[in-house]
Amino acid sequence: MDHLPIFCQLRDRDCLIVGGGDVAERKARLLLEAGARLTVNALTFIPQFTVWVNEGMLTLVEGPFDETLLDSCWLAIAATDDDTVNQRVSEAAESRRIFCNVVDAPKAASFIMPSIIDRSPLMVAVSSGGTSPVLARLLREKLESLLPQHLGQVARYAGQLRARVKKQFATMGERRRFWEKFFVNDRLAQSLANADEKAVNATTEHLFSEPLDHRGEVVLVGAGPGDAGLLTLKGLQQIQQADIVVYDRLVSDDIMNLVRRDADRVFVGKRAGYHCVPQEEINQILLREAQKGKRVVRLKGGDPFIFGRGGEELETLCHAGIPFSVVPGITAASGCSAYSGIPLTHRDYAQSVRLVTGHLKTGGELDWENLAAEKQTLVFYMGLNQAATIQEKLIAFGMEANMPVALVENGTSVKQRVVHGVLTQLGELAQQVESPALIIVGRVVALRDKLNWFSNH
């Protein structure tokens, strides 16, 4: 280990920055956020420094580097574009045993500045030891996505409750279980973010009053249409907090690789016309695991409330009194159309879009007359096996036979394939495509030749 990570208490302590440009401004912003009493020494200053002076936030000393400014300092930063000046600052600080950071010259510095994730009072610092700042920044961005913006408020509130927790729970094990419940409680986090004091108090009292071995909860999470980059931040956070993940065939391997390593995984995949696990059994799996006190994530492709039977699963939990929540996902219609260069609505061609199930039950009948109307886009989910029927019915109820159609297979993934033609070819085109696939019908499909971008990458 070349550098020891430490967190400095700089509030009301003298610090010096030498330099008045953009880099110095970024460093000054960090020190000001930490509460430092800051002096900036430079020949010239960008306008932001004048703003800070007018607000009484720092002191400017215009002119060449004056090493006597270091005499009362706790910490210094050399941030000029002159290597000679930066070296002088470093040597002067070293002679006074003052820690000094030299921008872009880690070997000349006695400390380096990490990439920072600020969820005060929670702070995360990422450093490559000065060898690869870009790598540190990329790692910071990944970690940013895992930590909710309101996490700092939750941590601060936890500090206010420490004495009460210590008083109410006698053992370390009890306290640990309480804090585990506390930090994964979405209702509390959202109430704190909304500054809803009444809801915060109610949720807090509930946490203190319920047994520590209470029943678990289920979070219904939409995984999006395939591309792992389309999983929402909240969805990612939930699957990384799960004790068990119950998932289906439409959840990609890339997304499953993001699941917490020690979480149990239960596959309940389905295919049209064949159910690996009956829906009632899935409902019972969710119920049984939650009753064991586990945090269960039901992970579904697309959005769980759009042809995902999410409502049915939650009704079972609701009847049993199991707490649940829902994290929406990008539905296949939105993701597949965007990655195919097909806008679902367009001022000239479609003023509405209709999402339709093609998985028709025996005796079921769609409102074909309205579906065949002009100026709209139709998106059929699970429609491959019914493609010939969809073609026949739409034409019979007045849709033009040459209406553009597209079938999107494995949408948004690297395996995406788009087959397109006109309505009279729909049944034939469906024979060329494998599930999972989406059928899009409407004049907007003709825009694909202009707007297709994904296949070019």
Curated annotation (Swiss-Prot):
NAD(+) binds at D22, V23, L43, T44. It holds the Pfam family Sirohm_synth_M. The modification Phosphoserine is found at S128. This is Siroheme synthase. It comes from Salmonella typhi. GO terms for molecular function: NAD binding; precorrin-2 dehydrogenase activity; sirohydrochlorin ferrochelatase activity; uroporphyrin-III C-methyltransferase activity. Residues 1-204 are annotated as: Precorrin-2 dehydrogenase /sirohydrochlorin ferrochelatase. One of its GO terms (biological process) is siroheme biosynthetic process. InterPro entries: 4pyrrol_Mease, 4pyrrol_Methylase_sf, 4pyrrole_Mease_sub1, 4pyrrole_Mease_sub2, CobA/CysG_C, NAD(P)-bd_dom_sf, Siro_Cobalamin_biosynth, Sirohaem_synt_dimer_dom_sf. The keyword Oxidoreductase applies. Gene3D superfamilies: Cobalt-precorrin-4 Transmethylase, Domain 1, Methyltransferase, Cobalt-precorrin-4 Transmethylase, Domain 2, NAD(P)-binding Rossmann-like Domain, Sirohaem synthase, dimerisation domain, Siroheme synthase, domain 2. CDD domains: SUMT (cd11642). Residues 216-457 are annotated as: Uroporphyrinogen-III C-methyltransferase. Pathway: Cofactor biosynthesis; adenosylcobalamin biosynthesis; precorrin-2 from uroporphyrinogen III: step 1/1; Cofactor biosynthesis; adenosylcobalamin biosynthesis; sirohydrochlorin from precorrin-2: step 1/1; Porphyrin-containing compound metabolism; siroheme biosynthesis; precorrin-2 from uroporphyrinogen III: step 1/1; Porphyrin-containing compound metabolism; siroheme biosynthesis; siroheme from sirohydrochlorin: step 1/1. Its EC number is 2.1.1.107, 1.3.1.76, 4.99.1.4. Then it catalyzes the NAD-dependent ring dehydrogenation of precorrin-2 to yield sirohydrochlorin. Finally, it catalyzes the ferrochelation of sirohydrochlorin to yield siroheme. It catalyses: uroporphyrinogen III + 2 S-adenosyl-L-methionine = precorrin-2 + 2 S-adenosyl-L-homocysteine + H(+); precorrin-2 + NAD(+) = sirohydrochlorin + NADH + 2 H(+); siroheme + 2 H(+) = sirohydrochlorin + Fe(2+). SUPFAM superfamilies: NAD(P)-binding Rossmann-fold domains, Siroheme synthase middle domains-like, Tetrapyrrole methylase. The active site is at D248 (proton acceptor), K270 (proton donor).
